[in-house]
């Protein structure tokens, strides 16, 4: 099997550790930083870092490429193994004993160009700026208006990222939906809405505001169009992986109080 290993900038040592182990059984055809430019073509991409590293690596992968993350960051929603579990991973790899998750991207079109996001796209004011009036038009429906600091449009993958911190719901990865969440809206009852993923969303503000794609500032714009992309990646999990256990352990959600 031809494997690429991509690592977070300061995690080269951990990447070398995995390379040494994996290369005993498989051909490592690429080894480098996840934020380096270019596409990666391999049978499997191994990522060393946290969720941010996985997001960068996913955009370099060909459609449908399986990916597996080794946790070397903080929360690690998108990582599946720890470095101490390398032997367990190699055993699972020999037998292809994984649970697979399909994680799809959204496509964002604006005057800044076309972008892909696995987590979310955000339009928000500068810290020194005033609140903005934002129009959100969902395909086949009339417009919604928010007077807020901004708005986040996220995938199910991104529901445990920025959207969660501003009151959005946790969405299981298998759901085919998009989540629209206003940031600090003027009216308390203005909450997140969840829509079918096949609906296009147009967001327009009164003035140029910041656009962030997966947390990375790309520039200022007034208008974006968001729709589900055909691009996707496959995240490999250990066979016993359970999403509820993950959100309970990492977020404390649904934890029993004794």
Curated annotation (Swiss-Prot):
InterPro entries: ATP-NAD_kinase_N (IPR017438), ATP-NAD_kinase_PpnK-typ_C (IPR017437), NAD/diacylglycerol_kinase_sf (IPR016064), NADK (IPR002504)
Record key words, sorted: ATP-binding, Cytoplasm, Kinase, NAD, NADP, Nucleotide-binding, Transferase
Catalytic activity of the protein: NAD(+) + ATP = ADP + NADP(+) + H(+)
RNA-binding recorded as keyword: no
Cofactor section: a divalent metal cation
Pfam families per the UniProt record, alphabetical: NAD_kinase (PF01513), NAD_kinase_C (PF20143)
Catalytic center residues: 51
GO biological process, one term: NADP biosynthetic process
GO molecular function, one term: ATP binding
Protein EC: 2.7.1.23
A single GO cellular-component term on record: cytoplasm
Sequence positions that bind NAD(+): 51-52, 119-120, 130, 149, 160-165, 184
Subcellular location, record wording: Cytoplasm
Family listed: Belongs to the NAD kinase family.
PANTHER family, sorted: NAD KINASE
Protein's job: Involved in the regulation of the intracellular balance between NAD(H) and NADP(H), and is a key enzyme in the biosynthesis of NADP. Catalyzes specifically the phosphorylation on 2'-hydroxyl of the adenosine moiety of NAD to yield NADP.
HAMAP family: NAD_kinase
Protein's recorded name: NAD kinase
Organism name: Thermotoga maritima (strain ATCC 43589 / DSM 3109 / JCM 10099 / NBRC 100826 / MSB8)
């Amino acid at each position: 099997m031809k494997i690429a290993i991509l690592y977070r900038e300061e995690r080269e040592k951990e990447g070398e550790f995995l390379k040494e182990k994996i290369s005993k059984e498989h051909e490592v055809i690429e080894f480098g930083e996840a934020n380096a430019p270019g596409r990666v073509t391999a049978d499997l991409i191994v990522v060393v870092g946290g969720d941010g590293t996985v997001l960068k690596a996913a955009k370099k992968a060909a459609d449908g490429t399986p990916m597996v993350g080794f946790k070397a960051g903080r929360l690690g929603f998108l990582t599946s193994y720890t470095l101490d579990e390398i032997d367990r991973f190699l055993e699972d790899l020999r037998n292809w004993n994984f649970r697979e998750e399909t994680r799809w991207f959204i496509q964002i079109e604006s005057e800044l160009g076309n972008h892909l996001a696995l987590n979310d796209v955000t339009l928000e004011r500068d810290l020194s700026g005033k609140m903005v009036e934002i129009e959100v038009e969902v395909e086949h429906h009339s417009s919604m208006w928010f007077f807020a600091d901004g708005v986040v449009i996220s995938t199910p993958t991104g529901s445990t990222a920025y959207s969660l911190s501003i009151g959005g719901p946790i969405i299981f990865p298998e759901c085919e939906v998009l989540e629209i969440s206003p940031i600090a809206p003027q009216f308390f009852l203005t909450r997140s809405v969840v829509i079918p993923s096949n609906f296009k969303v147009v967001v327009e503000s009164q003035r140029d505001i910041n656009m962030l794609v997966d947390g990375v500032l790309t520039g200022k714009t007034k208008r974006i169009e968001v729709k589900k992309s055909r691009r996707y990646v496959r995240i490999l999990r250990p066979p016993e992986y359970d999403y509820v256990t993950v959100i309970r352990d990492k977020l404390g959600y649904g934890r029993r109080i004794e």
